[in-house]
């Protein structure tokens, strides 16, 4: 069985963003040489997310508005976590809602997606470098 590991690095210049990383995962799969197996992709930071959904800008705006209603950034004093001197209590909650990782089947050397599925990196406390792990195992 083959095993392949790669890190992607994102330095998002704004607080919140969704970035389509499907192409980068397809590149990693090609580099790995794996034809049948699994690809795990996870955010390595507790204020970022990796998730699967449709690449439609209205949906991304809906996510952003919905998450901001569930866990608004302001007032920062509303979060006990922020008593530590941080101002990102909301980002931790947003990450928890959107999830940490995805696992995608690899079939015949391709990511085995449904019709509209693509993979996204969700940033909820940007403005500094963050890593995403790609781990591929298989034959």
Predicted ranges, named:
Residues 1-139:
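Active-site histidine-anchored catalytic micro-motif
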